[in-house]
Regions:
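Sec/Tat-exported extracytoplasmic proteins
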Residues: 1-3, 23-27, 54, 100, ...
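Extracellular/periplasmic Venus flytrap/periplasmic-binding protein
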Residues: 1-103
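Generic signature of mature, soluble extracytoplasmic domains
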Residues: 3, 103-106, 112-121, 131-132, ...
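Stable alpha-helical elements in mature extracytoplasmic
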Residues: 15-22, 39, 43-46, 104-107, ...
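Extracellular/periplasmic periplasmic-binding protein-like sensory domains
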Residues: 28-29, 48-76, 91-95, 103, ...
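Structural signal for conserved beta-strand scaffold positions within catalytic alpha/beta enzyme cores
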Residues: 35, 126, 145-148, 227, ...
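Short, solvent-exposed coil/turn elements at secondary-structure transition points
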Residues: 36-40, 130, 150, 231
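Segments of small-molecule ligand-sensing domains
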Residues: 165-177, 184-233
């Protein structure tokens, strides 16, 4: 289903200037920005304002009062239905992109759930989370979509690394792992490496965790889209 009312959210922290620069370069159309506090105590109130939570809560109470003194079957059933709700009314967006990580991301997700944002009507997306399984257990969002490296290769690399060193690697090491492969490819193809220009291949290069392409002096990694579903990472 096509989404037309998107909000891109990110925290006010040390990376704010960098994130805003990247967002500006994307030239996104019809996308609203929402900057929130990195303080969880302030965040909840900000999310309530974003989702018009107080008004939607009042809408529900007013609607319930219309049926409280009625005794006909239809009114009783409607009141029973309303009693199952927390708010009444829609939010003014149908998709969210959250540029955040770790506990800060979980605080945002928890606040959105608390503010009764429908997971059936609003698409939740975020940036690469490196298959952080704690997302499964520390919030009640059923489905979150995000781009990431190849999950199978990522898992195989982690297991191989652990078997060798008895600790799990951080995410940077797997990027270095593919970087070494890229250096070897350039050396084998050209016979030597003299400058960065030796890495500007026309063809795409498939690494352990993804496919890389080279254009305008930049290296771009092609990522897959995954979603969390029933405590699993599913390639979308």
């Amino acid at each position: 289903q096509k989404k037309t009312k998107t909000i891109i959210m990110y925290p006010k922290n040390d990376y704010l200037e960098l994130i805003e620069k990247k967002v500006k370069n994307l030239n996104l159309n019809n996308v609203k920005k929402f900057i929130y506090s990195s303080n969880p105590e302030i965040l909840t109130g900000e999310i309530e304002i974003l989702t018009n939570y107080s008004q939607r809560k009042r809408n529900l109470e007013l609607r319930k009062k219309l049926f409280e003194d009625k005794e006909d079957y239809q009114s009783i059933k409607e009141l029973e239905r309303l009693e199952q709700l927390y708010t009444l009314g829609e939010v003014n967006f149908d998709s969210i992109i959250i540029v955040d990580f770790g506990n800060s991301l979980k605080s945002v997700l928890t606040s959105l759930v608390y503010s009764d944002v429908s997971q059936d009507k609003v698409l939740f997306t975020t940036v690469n989370q490196w298959f952080d399984e704690s997302i499964f257990y520390e919030n009640t969002i059923k489905n979150i979509y995000y781009p990431s490296v190849n999950y199978k290769e990522f898992s195989k690399y982690n297991n191989k690394y652990y078997k060798k060193f008895k600790i799990y690697p951080n995410e940077i090491t797997i990027l270095a792992y593919d970087a070494l492969g890229l250096i070897y490819y350039a050396w084998k193809k050209n016979g030597e490496i003299n400058s960065v220009k030796d890495f500007l291949f026309k063809d795409k290069i498939k690494g352990k965790i993804g496919t890389f392409s080279f254009k305008n002096g930049r290296v771009t990694q092609e990522l897959d889209i995954y979603k969390t579903d029933k405590k699993k990472f599913i390639k979308f």
